[in-house]
Each structure stands twice: as C-alpha cells, then as structure tokens.
C-alpha cells in the first residue's frame, strides 16, 4: 500500500521559513505510486504553500468549523477549504480536543461537512497516558470512532484516513513502542472490520507521535502502519525529506 507522509506544522513558521521549507521539500525525489505527501500549514499561509509546492504534494488545513456560512467570526468553512484548493483536512487532533474542548460529536460534525467533497479527511484519535495505564485504551478509541462508524456509509468511510496519535507521545519525545503501535493499529483495523472487511484492509491508518527520521524506518515498516503524521520533525526539510526517503525505500523493497 502507498505510504502517506504528512507534515503538521501547527502554529509555526512565517513567510520566510515556510518558503525555505517548501523549497526544501520540493527537492525530495520519490515515487508517487509508493508515497504520497501532504502538508498542513497554518491557514494564513495555505495559499502561499500551494503556490510554492509541486502539484504532487497535497496541502491541507488543520481545522474547520462545522457551520456552513454566516456570523461566525474567525471560522473557516468546508466550502472555503474546497474553494482555495486544499486537498486534505485534519480533524480532531489531540490539541484541538484537549485545548479547545472538541468533542467526538464536534469531530463527526466537521467530518460530515466534507465527506462528500473532494477533500481527504484525516481523523485523529488517541489515548492519554492515564487511559493506557488504566486499561481503557480500546474503550477510548472505540468511543472516539463510534459516531463515525455508525453514521457513515462504507463508501464514505473509504475516503477517510485515520491517524493514531497517543497523546502522551505528542511533542514529548516519548515514542510508543513498536509493539504498542502495531497492536493499536491492529485493534483500530478490527473495529473497521466489524463494518466491512474490505474497508478494514484498504483504509489508511497512519501513526503520529514523535515520529522522526531516526525511528521512521522501524515504525513505517510495521505491517499495519500506512504512513505518518509528523509534527516537530516536519519543520526541518532535511529531516522531513529523510522520512519521505525511508518511506520510499520501504515501499520499494
């Protein structure tokens, strides 16, 4: 399966640094049949990034509102996202859930706004350290996915990318063990299999959580890992490109 390597730049960068990043990423060589790339800049830089990257690199937004139009100061709608030429959308990132109190219902409502558009939704799920240590991992992940799996058709679900990001491994430098990643991705796939076996086999499940060049090969080689959602390591073109190179090699072998 093609690996999907995504860069979440979060609230980082300025016009100068983003121009340098785009220039660096534009230099990396990879087989587009084996690797797909997407970047998620801050919304104010989306048009700049689209204009500075090759067409083969997807560009996405980090968040939208679930309202269509109207008096919602500061918000961005799904229609606007499509209008400016975005390819991807992050939904339900752990920082949105924890810092802005986004609920599973909010995540579903946002997903529902774009599921029938040309935009690829990347739905983020993950557990806290307390959840894992108290044995609630499976319960938490199943709950986070329940509205989505119960209310979307198989055809709609097939458009979704799922990003598993253990909250305790995001921005901390702590990485889940290979065994933990593999077991969790397999569990997520088993939830999807209850809906449709073919869906479970073909849907992309990517890993996010302190993924960087030095551990990319091991993580991306796991059988149930279809790519990565990279945070801090994506802010340096050299390191992000090395992750892309590792993904390309894995898919070539």
UniProtKB/Swiss-Prot annotation:
EC number annotated for this UniProt entry: 5.3.1.1
GO MF terms, alphabetically ordered: triose-phosphate isomerase activity
Claim: Protein transport is one of the keywords in the record: no
Major site of localization recorded for this protein: cytoplasm
Biological process annotations from GO: gluconeogenesis; glyceraldehyde-3-phosphate biosynthetic process; glycerol catabolic process; glycolytic process
Catalytic activity: D-glyceraldehyde 3-phosphate = dihydroxyacetone phosphate
Catalytic residues, chain numbering: 93, 165
Family listed: Belongs to the triosephosphate isomerase family.
Quaternary structure annotation from Swiss-Prot or TrEMBL: Homodimer.
Designated name of the protein: Triosephosphate isomerase
Gene designation per UniProt: tpiA
């Amino acid at each position: 399966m093609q690996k999907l390597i995504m860069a979440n730049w979060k609230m980082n960068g300025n016009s100068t640094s983003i121009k340098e990043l785009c220039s660096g990423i534009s230099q990396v060589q990879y087989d587009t049949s084996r690797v797909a790339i997407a970047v998620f800049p801050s919304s104010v830089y989306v048009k700049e990034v689209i204009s500075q990257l090759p067409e083969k690199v997807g560009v996405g937004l980090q968040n939208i509102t679930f309202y269509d139009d109207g008096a919602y100061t500061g918000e961005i709608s799904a229609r606007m996202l499509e209008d400016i030429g975005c390819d991807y959308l992050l939904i339900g990132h752990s920082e949105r859930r924890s810092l802005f109190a986004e609920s599973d219902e909010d995540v579903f409502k946002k997903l529902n706004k774009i599921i029938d558009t040309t935009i690829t939704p990347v739905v983020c799920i993950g557990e806290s350290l307390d959840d894992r240590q108290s044995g609630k991992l499976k319960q938490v992940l199943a709950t986070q996915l329940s509205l989505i799996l119960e209310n979307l058709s198989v055809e709609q679900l097939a458009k979704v990318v799922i990003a598993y990001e253990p909250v305790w491994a995001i921005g901390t430098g702590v990485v889940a063990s290979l065994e933990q990643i593999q077991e969790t991705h397999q569990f997520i796939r088993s939830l999807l299999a209850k809906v449709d076996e073919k869906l479970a086999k073909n849907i992309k499940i990517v890993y996010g959580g302190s993924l960087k060049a030095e551990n990319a090969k091991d993580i991306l080689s796991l059988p149930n890992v279809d790519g990565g959602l990279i945070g801090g390591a994506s802010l340096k073109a050299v390191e992000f490109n090395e992750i892309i190179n590792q993904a390309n090699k894995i898919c070539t072998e």
